[in-house]
Amino acid sequence: MDFLNAVILGIVEGLTEFLPVSSTGHMILSAKLLGLEQTSVLKCFEVVIQLGSILAVVFMFFDRLKEDFNLWIKLAIGFVPTAIIGFLAYKHIKTFFEPSTVAYMLIIGGIVFIVVELWHKKINYEGDTKTLHEVSFKQAFIIGLSQCFAMIPGTSRSGSTIITGLLCGLSREVAARFSFLLAIPTMFAATAYDSYKNADIFVQNKEALWIFLVGGFMAFIVALIVIKLFLKFVSKFSYISFGIYRIILGSIFLIYIL
């Protein structure tokens, strides 16, 4: 892996981590197109650039997080189910990382997005929960529980939490905001655990540190831009376009990767 690859993959991570399109699927496809093998170095690189994306959320919502203790309680409630199931099922989760799984889950998730949005349109429903302050502890727990589905590659953490948020009565924008914020404890924990499990690989590849940092920085900058634009988009439009995109990408996976 060189600096150009690091920049490209960092951009891909920043673009897709918080969109409901599966960053894992895009990273696998991008690595394939760049001719990169799934080596231990690439796995460590993915951990670092994911950290860059998380820091973008912290930076974006820092003032809100600093002032709203009640929000932290909701995030903790949402994080607990994922933490428990993720810790217990860590070894089994890694066995799901197959291109075929990613492809099928992309398509299934896309169909679900379209169905949910069309259903909401039919009954003229846009969500009763219009602000983060109105999100209840029960809603936070259910949305957090849905993150467990995102342990299956291709599902998308943001995708599963946003869909569940919509089904729980959150507006499109609030569902997206809560999904972003819930990523902070969830992704920090996942990144820390992966780093711990792969500590020896990091030590063995210290010469790649600058490449890791370049990728992480690119992911941070791009994620900041994407979060701002995405929130503006969902305040005006539905998630149907993302559902269609997922189905197209999943089909490309089935044709190209498999």
From Swiss-Prot:
It is found in: Cell inner membrane. The keyword Cell membrane applies. The keyword RNA-binding does not apply. The chain crosses the membrane at residues 1-21, 42-62, 69-89, 96-116, 135-155, 173-193, 211-231, 237-257. Keywords: Antibiotic resistance, Cell inner membrane, Cell membrane, Cell shape, Cell wall biogenesis/degradation, Hydrolase, Membrane, Peptidoglycan synthesis, Transmembrane, Transmembrane helix. Its EC number is 3.6.1.27. PANTHER family: UNDECAPRENYL-DIPHOSPHATASE (PTHR30622:SF3). This is Undecaprenyl-diphosphatase. It comes from Campylobacter fetus subsp. fetus (strain 82-40).
